[in-house]
From Swiss-Prot:
Name listed for the protein in its UniProt record: ATP-dependent dethiobiotin synthetase BioD
Keyword Oxidoreductase: no
Main location as per UniProt: cytoplasm
Cofactor(s) required for function per UniProt: Mg(2+)
A Pfam cross-reference name: AAA_26
Residues involved in ATP binding: 12-17, 51, 112-115, 202-204
Record-annotated active site: 37
GO biological processes: biotin biosynthetic process
Keyword check for S-adenosyl-L-methionine: no
HAMAP family, per database record: BioD
Domain of life assignment: Bacteria
Binding site for Mg(2+): 16, 51, 112
Sequence positions that bind substrate: 41
Gene: bioD
Length: 231
């Protein structure tokens, strides 16, 4: 299976904006792209503002909301914690079984995780274990500001310790008037981590299909990305 797994150095770093934008960009380049975000917490998958809805709209996939996100919980917490509150536990086998049912419906897939790669999804597995099982290269979405060097470095080193391939890093949310840390962090992260920076993307005032697509077109190196992940 061709594609990649989008994770982050933290929650709310812009994984879904980047994932959906890349899906739209691949679609724009005549790729038959699917999306899979197995876990969602804190909002209905059918809500127009949900991550699932944005991924579906931007990728133009025929997959249903339930196909894209089979496991949804009410509380805005880590999936394992939110699931326990509802008396639901999702096993790794269930995640992979659902993946097996949808993976052949598209030529390539963008899979999005929940939070960072150490977030617990079930009783005995983390996001990192799902990435390893799917055997897709990772794209790490990171913050631009102070502290991101440490967060990104730790994410990269943990991924490497798990034997997870990393396609690259996207620094998301640069302000209109970047501070010195925002200007210097991308180069420092690339040098310390030994992983290519695929793009540095601005903070969007309004998230729409048009603004997200323009953002990824203008600020992400698509040719480098496609070479890295084989799509």
């Amino acid at each position: 299976m061709r594609g990649f797994f989008v994770t982050g150095t933290d929650t709310e770093v812009g994984k879904t904006v980047i994932s959906s934008g890349l899906a739209a960009l691949l679609k724009d380049n005549n790729r038959h792209v699917g999306v899979y975000k197995p876990f969602l917490s804190g909002i209905s998958r059918h809500h127009p503002d949900s991550d699932t809805s944005l991924l579906k709209d931007m990728s133009q996939t025929s997959l249903s909301h339930e196909d894209i996100t089979p496991f949804a919980f009410k509380a805005p917490l880590a999936p394992y914690v939110a699931g326990k509150l509802e008396g639901k536990t999702v096993t790794m086998e269930e995640v992979l079984s659902h993946w097996g049912r949808i993976r052949e419906k598209h030529e390539c897939f963008i899979v999005e995780g929940a939070g960072g790669i150490s977030v617990p999804l079930g009783e005995d597995y983390l996001v990192s274990h799902v990435i390893k099982a799917l055997q897709l290269p990772m794209i790490i979405v990171a913050r631009p500001r102070l502290g991101t060097i440490n967060h990104t470095f730790l994410t990269v080193k943990y991924a490497e310790s798990m034997g997870l391939p990393i396609a690259g890093i996207i620094i998301n949310g640069i302000s209109d008037s970047p501070d010195e840390d925002e200007k210097t962090n991308p180069e420092m992260i690339e040098r310390l981590c030994g992983v290519p920076i695929l793009g540095v993307t601005p903070k969007l005032a309004n998230v729409t299909k048009e603004t997200v697509l323009h953002m990824v077109k203008d600020h992400i190196n698509l040719s480098l990305l496609m070479n890295q992940v084989g799509v």
